[in-house]
Amino acid sequence: MCFERNTPLCMVVFILLVFCFFTDLIGFAIPYWYKADYNASGIMIISYGGLWEFCKESIHNTSCVNWVDDGFAGWFHAVRTFSTLSWIFSLSSLILVVLFFFYDRAMMYLASVCLSVIGAFCSLTSFLLYAVESSGDQKKFYSAFTLTITAFLLGLTAGVVGIIDFLLHFGDRERH
């Protein structure tokens, strides 16, 4: 089968990229980048939101609305953009490493690894920008924010392991 000729580190990169893709996708999509609790007329209200949706929850009901692009600060658009790019790069990297299993082209593997690192830095930019710009608010960072940090770490680790693997095993093959 196609996996037999690949190195163990290549399989580690593949597994890291799968987890990176799914953590990035979930962090990108769910409305849990922040959570805030406040008391309104004796009723405890919990609000939470992400890049695309905002929700309010009380004992009586929960309502969610999609964010409308009007009136957002430029930094929030930048966070959305870098999160979107991160997700696209992690998907592209995963597709290329799967194609590498079938076509065994070292440059395809190297491109996958490079896209993983680029996606990781897009993820880093998005969560750092969000953290810096919303640090004065009475919000607590929540699970999707943590998933974005996890996706950054997984993507960067996959990139570093992949570059090491490429230099150890595939670099000689490309020179001959």
What function would you assign to each model-found segment?
Residues 2-34, 76-133, 145-172:
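Signature of small four-pass
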Residues 24-80, 97-98:
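A surface-exposed beta-alpha-beta supersecondary segment
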Residues 63-67, 71-74, 131-148:
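Interfacial non-cytosolic loop connecting adjacent transmembrane helices
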